[in-house]
Amino acid sequence: MLKQRILTALIALSVLAIVLFFVPPVVARAAVVVLILAGAWEWGGFLAGESNGARIAYTLFIGALVGALLVAQDNPLVVENVFRLALVWWLSALVWMLFFPTPIPRALTWVCGALVLVPAWAALDFLYRQTPDLLIFVLLIVWVADIGAFFVGKGFGRVKLAPQISPGKTWEGVLGGLTAVVLLAAAGSRYFDIDVAVLVPFCVAVAMLSV
């Protein structure tokens, strides 16, 4: 499983690097939109099972939201408000997980998908427009945290993190993932010339959301 995770991460990173650095920006940004729409298709499956009509409708719904945001993204307040909304959503989701499993109405599930997918696209597109290096670095935080948590958790995991939500995860794995991310942040601070005291807390926060 560990080898598979590392191999998947390396393949994904290689494909991503090709898309980000060797194709025109408009194509790279379009590829990110396609990725988000693929996520919308999968999310539609959670809502409607095997109903392709509902999945198509949900994919079009997310596509329309992304399109509207594309039109308005030159207004910095719009993008900032999307990120604020995403922050509120993820904090609310963390609270909701304390009461897991708790059923939610199907209509709210549609909204939850939009709150996951649309801000994700906005963040990926924003990072790419700053510099592709920064986008890859943020994705590396997630991948390194995942691989580090899996490796340490498999070898030393004893105390379960959240048995009802993800029985296989342990606190030892979390600490292993965060340690790996701190090392990545130290390297990133030199590459991007950012104070390590600033970058480490940022990377740890991102990793905490991912594990």
Predicted regions mapped to residue ranges:
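Membrane-embedded alpha-helical bundles of polytopic integral membrane proteins
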Residues: L2-V206
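Functionally important transmembrane alpha-helices
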Residues: S210-V211
